[in-house]
């Protein structure tokens, strides 16, 4: 069985900046996904490179500048993640997700499948809870992650062409 690592990125003391952590917790609380590890990645650290290297599949939730309305959710998969990270619009953290992916790539331990689920923030600043707009996005963000996990785990012969 493949193992999936779900990272929630962000600072929960800065309102919507903690959206990734809140989305990860929502997924863990509302979905039964065996062989899935949930990790509050905070504002990221190079120490997470080992966790990423040991994952077959990786999903990262984060507040991201996706040029959309507050609370909108966008899913980037595999090469789309790489393109988005190269755009420089995404991370407000000291160590970026792009840095961690580069480490995994250089060491030859890039997960087989990976996705970034970005949530457009509304309020960045002090606050121990996300804005109402971003809070309402949690079910949609978690549902997207659960769907990806199920899709990635299906045997190849069960996946219809074009999915």
Regions found by a protein language model. Give the residues of each.
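N-terminal catalytic or cofactor-binding beta/alpha core of small enzyme domains
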Residues: 1-112, 116-119, 128-139, 144-163
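Short "lid" loop at the C-terminus of a central beta-strand within the Rossmann-like core
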Residues: 122
């Amino acid at each position: 069985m493949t193992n999936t690592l779900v990272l929630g990125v962000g600072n929960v003391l800065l309102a919507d900046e903690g959206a990734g952590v809140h989305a990860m917790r929502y997924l863990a609380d509302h979905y039964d996904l065996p062989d899935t590890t949930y990790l509050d990645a905070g504002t990221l650290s190079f120490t997470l490179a080992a966790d990423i290297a040991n994952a077959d599949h990786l999903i990262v939730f984060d507040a991201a500048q996706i040029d959309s309305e507050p609370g909108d959710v966008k899913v980037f998969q595999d090469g789309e993640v790489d393109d988005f990270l190269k755009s420089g619009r995404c991370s407000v953290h000291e160590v970026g997700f792009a840095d961690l992916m580069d480490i995994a790539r250089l060491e030859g331990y890039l997960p087989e499948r990976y996705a970034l689920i970005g949530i457009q923030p509304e309020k960045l600043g002090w606050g121990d809870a996300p804005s109402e707009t971003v809070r309402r996005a949690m079910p949609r963000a978690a549902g997207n992650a659960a769907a990806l996990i199920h899709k990635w785990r299906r045997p190849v012969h069960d996946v219809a062409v074009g999915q």
